[in-house]
Amino acid sequence: MLYKGDTLYLDWLEDGIAELVFDAPSSVNKLDTATVASLGEAIGVLEQQSDLKGLLLRSNKAAFIVGADITEFLSLFLVPEEQLSQWLHFANSVFNRLEDLPVPTIAAVNGYALGGGCECVLATDYRLATPDLRIGLPETKLGIMPGFGGSVRMPRMLGADSALEIIAAGKDVGADQALKIGLVDGVVKAEKLIEGAMAILRQAINGDLDWKAKRQPKLEPLKLSKIEATMSFTIAKGMVAQTAGKHYPAPITAVKTIEAAARFGREEALNLENKSFVPLAHTNEARALIGIFLNDQYVKGKAKKLTKDVETPKQAAVLGAGIMGGGIAYQSAWKGVPVVMKDINDKSLTLGMTEAAKLLNKQLERGKIDGLKLAGVISTIHPTLDYAGFDRVDVVVEAVVENPKVKKAVLAETEQKVRPDTVLASNTSTIPISELANALERPENFCGMHFFNPVHRMPLVEIIRGEKSSDETIAKVVAWASKMGKTPIVVNDCPGFFVNRVLFPYFAGFSQLLRDGADFRKIDKVMEKQFGWPMGPAYLLDVVGIDTAHHAQAVMAAGFPQRMQKDYRDAIDALFDANRFGQKNGLGFWHYKEDSKGKPKKEEDAAVDDLLAEVSQPKRDFSEEEIIARMMIPMVNEVVRCLEEGIIATPAEADMALVYGLGFPPFHGGAFRWLDTLGSAKYLDMAQQYQHLGPLYEVPEGLRNKARHNEPYYPPVEPARPVGDLKTA
């Protein structure tokens, strides 16, 4: 053994060839600060070996290196910029020394090589991969950019265009694509990986492969003519501006850094990467996006822990076809759980099957599946007008009309047709689960399962625990949601549950602004362009359906009369009474026409202003700050109440439900992350300016306490040890 660290070791393989093996004590290899230091020590040992002829890098895990240790980021990024820069210089000196070894090097890459894992293998001369490879640089999705030389080596290896596509978008690619663009030199079966890598290494040692020529471009300026550079970087900057926008500084910073570094050799280019990385690491956007990553891990880990002792349902059923039922059936079948889809109406069944077929055909058009796979999936969806096959199902989700009487009748009838251990769930969006459970003989086998539309796109599923729902019932439904590729979050029961309960105060803020003379077009523009929502409230209401919102608004008002009962006729009432239901009938806040692709395109409609004039004061202008405050305060207050009342368990779950269920702007990180960034005292000052608008603007006592003691909702993160104290040699 040449060297043994906590997460890697170095040993001789055969005559003059050494292997450096990543083998962390945990289930995966991560490139944390300790591993970077160990790598430096191992390379120091290699540099002393006069008889060294070649080096093989490999992993003892199912994945090579999954990336840096993201849990370290929040504390590491709190150290002063100068110290962070110093540590990055050290880390890059380690990879430079790996790259500068006087012998050929190869990485045998299996599974994931992401972020720092990808940057590590970019420093070797050759890369051989297995078919399960996923390799790339996802840093911009975390609000940062590659910091271990990825923005320097990748463009010089692949050319600017391919590298920019991966780095700016935070992409990873599979084995075939990696081979095609030159990110790896070959792909072999897993059992042949080491044998194949050794064969390449021997060829390089023997002089059959010119490893020095392979290494040289990574040390030099990027080989691009002035015209090529102008085209590549102009197109990349345009694409980034269009897709990322102003709220995500990392992608455009990465592109500009690669452009600026193009004319320099490795050392100066790495200095430019360092200078760009450090300020990004200190942005609120990076903290928010890293927070989302960590929250996502927490939520998925919680679901995994919850379901460890239950069997995932093998056969499911959906009650109620149509668009929603068809979407649920598709998602279940697509992920391998056959489903019976029942409706009392043949036309609805046809609509549900058409929806599932349409979604599968889209996968076919994109080349994700072939005709055989399509036929196989669709054959596992069984439409029926009766209860045939229900005696075999493990779980049933009801997705009929949002009417408590209808839902109770359907659920009670279904309970008589299934096994005693079959779990029933309702896809209601607002009706309390405990109320629906009153119709059942086995309420312990019942819970809520709230999908979001469109089902195939929206990651969140709210799992609602009723008063009598058993732990096993919740676990089984969480297991099914996870199997469907969704992110399940368990919430406690109340009208609207979590997501709709906090959404309708937001809509109430919108209605009050309109009542007071604001223009809905400006509100939408501000909430989209300035705050960052994917849709403004008017557009969102049109997509949800004015009729749906009108009904849900009444349910929420009955559930929370003190705050949500309004004493005036609002814009939603006015549009509903005029039969303007949104996109579904082409008339809402906008007039909708289909474009050439059959998608609804919104157009101005003067009739709306006349309708709104009946329920509004004369038009007046509101500042962007006032619009944002009046829209967000009711929502954030309600989010805080949900945490205080135990409707949602943690700030992390609340923020993920908002991001995944409503599209809360990820660069804000969710309501609690936004609150922490703003500061609870500053938020309280802002909210008090609007408390005259009514109970929705009254700040909950728990939040007032936070403001008094200057306490955040997320545990405060301590800065990493001074970088000088980290192992840097």
Curated annotation (Swiss-Prot):
Pathways involved: Lipid metabolism; fatty acid beta-oxidation
Annotated site (Important for catalytic activity): 119, 139
Gene Ontology biological process terms, A to Z: fatty acid beta-oxidation
Catalysed reactions, as listed in the record: a (3S)-3-hydroxyacyl-CoA + NAD(+) = a 3-oxoacyl-CoA + NADH + H(+); a (3S)-3-hydroxyacyl-CoA = a (2E)-enoyl-CoA + H2O; a 4-saturated-(3S)-3-hydroxyacyl-CoA = a (3E)-enoyl-CoA + H2O; (3S)-3-hydroxybutanoyl-CoA = (3R)-3-hydroxybutanoyl-CoA
Protein origin, superkingdom: Bacteria
EC number: 4.2.1.17, 5.1.2.3, 5.3.3.8, 1.1.1.35
Annotated segments matching region Enoyl-CoA hydratase/isomerase: 1-189
Binding site for NAD(+): 324, 343, 400-402, 407, 429, 453
Region (Disordered): 708-729
Residues holding substrate: 296, 500, 660
A GO molecular-function descriptor: enoyl-CoA hydratase activity
Active site: 450
Keywords from the named record: Fatty acid metabolism, Isomerase, Lipid degradation, Lipid metabolism, Lyase, Multifunctional enzyme, NAD, Oxidoreductase
3-hydroxyacyl-CoA dehydrogenase: annotated span: 311-729
Stored PROSITE patterns: 3HCDH (PS00067), ENOYL_COA_HYDRATASE (PS00166)
Gene Ontology CC: fatty acid beta-oxidation multienzyme complex
Oligomeric form and interacting partners: Heterotetramer of two alpha chains (FadB) and two beta chains (FadA).
Family: In the N-terminal section; belongs to the enoyl-CoA hydratase/isomerase family.
Alphabetical list of HAMAP family matching this protein: FadB (MF_01621)
NCBIfam families, sorted: FadB, PRK11730.1
Name recorded for this polypeptide: Fatty acid oxidation complex subunit alpha
